[in-house]
């Protein structure tokens, strides 16, 4: 495993002379779909050439101006899954590269669902241009796997996972209904056939869940209904070159650290129909001694989940200049204390 005090560059460029590297055990977290917003990344791209270059690389790889959609919208276009996924990946990688230029580098990486691709770019497992094209296809395949309206997802709050799983099994009635995102002790998202998910949400409320909220999603992610998408994506992923991760990546589907190229590819394939075991992944990193988590990309969803998992850990988000300077100050203070 690389020394956390040695900045690395996935494509071999050395750090700048005198680059300041914070001591301590840092994990970078990368958000998934749903965190997108019009304007994301624009300020950083205007201030940091490496962020602008990242958006330009994405534009070239995709053959259209993704940057324009991210910065100007319209929101309806940015919400299209095959645009949302490369947009969030690009924003996340731009933030990662700015942090790296500042000498703030991770010892571990993890990403929620789509964010796992961002984590692999940060770890040097995947080339950015390969990842951005692949997640465009991933979004398209997921959207096409189930006709609109036939699938659904719901967030169940304040109910233990075992009870949620039991309710899913009861509600299924020969349809698909299963835990899809095990986000925190307080939040499990379920996914499957719309009638089954609706039945499960009602059962959860009857049996004491704090809330059961139907989510405004375009497809039922991370469940067996995504099998057609999984098969199409597997064919794409198997054509890509995966390098051994330069830092371990906590994978969603197993809540284990990926430290080899072949396992990384396999985990991304299985992730399409498998649950995101986020809480377990975070507890794994905590057990490895991670002191500070940085959420690199739009929004603060993962920092919010970390507060539910372990309030004693520091989790900071970076999505614009103000949040970036807050993180820089945090590490500057940490170094001189």
Segments (PLM) and residue ranges:
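A short, acidic, amphipathic alpha-helical segment used as a generic capping/interface helix at domain edges
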Residues: 274-290
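Alpha/beta catalytic cores of group-transfer enzymes, especially the acyltransferase/condensing modules
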Residues: 33-35, 62-64, 123-274
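FabD-like malonyl-/acyl-CoA
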Residues: 2-164, 215, 292-326
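NAD(P)-dependent dehydrogenase/reductase Rossmann-like domain
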Residues: 196-197, 236, 312, 321-337
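Short, solvent-exposed amphipathic alpha-helical segments in soluble enzyme
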Residues: 45-46, 170-172, 205-207, 308-311, ...
């Amino acid at each position: 495993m690389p020394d956390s005090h040695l900045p690395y560059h996935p494509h071999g460029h050395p750090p700048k002379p005198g680059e300041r590297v914070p001591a301590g055990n840092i994990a970078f977290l990368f958000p998934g779909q749903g965190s997108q917003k019009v304007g994301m990344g624009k300020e950083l791209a205007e201030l940091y050439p490496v962020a602008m270059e990242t958006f330009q690389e994405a534009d070239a790889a995709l053959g259209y101006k993704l940057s324009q959609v991210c910065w100007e919208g319209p929101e309806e276009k940015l919400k299209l899954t095959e645009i949302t996924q490369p947009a969030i990946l690009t924003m996340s990688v731009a933030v990662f590269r700015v942090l790296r230029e500042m000498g703030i580098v991770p010892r571990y990486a993890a990403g929620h669902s789509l964010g796992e691709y961002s984590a692999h770019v940060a770890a040097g497992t995947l080339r950015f241009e390969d990842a951005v094209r692949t997640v465009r296809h991933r979004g398209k395949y997921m959207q096409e796997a189930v006709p609109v309206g036939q699938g659904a997802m719901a967030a169940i709050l304040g109910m233990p996972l075992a009870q949620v799983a039991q309710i899913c099994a009861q509600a299924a009635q020969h349809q698909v209904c299963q835990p899809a995102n095990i986000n925190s002790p307080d939040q499990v998202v379920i996914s499957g056939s719309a009638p089954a998910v609706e039945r499960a949400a009602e059962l959860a409320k009857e049996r004491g869940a704090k809330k059961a909220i139907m989510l405004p999603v375009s497809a039922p992610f991370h469940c067996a209904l995504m099998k057609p998408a999984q098969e199409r994506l597997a064919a794409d992923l198997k054509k890509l070159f995966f390098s051994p991760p330069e830092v371990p990546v906590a994978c969603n589907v197993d809540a284990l650290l990926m430290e080899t190229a072949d396992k990384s590819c396999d985990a991304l394939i299985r992730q399409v129909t498998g649950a995101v075991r986020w809480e377990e992944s975070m507890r794994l990193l905590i057990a490895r001694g991670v002191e500070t988590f940085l959420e690199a990309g739009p929004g603060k969803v993962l920092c919010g989940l970390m507060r539910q998992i372990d309030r004693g850990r520091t989790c900071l988000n970076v999505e614009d200049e103000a949040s970036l300077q807050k993180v820089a100050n945090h590490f500057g203070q940490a170094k001189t204390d």
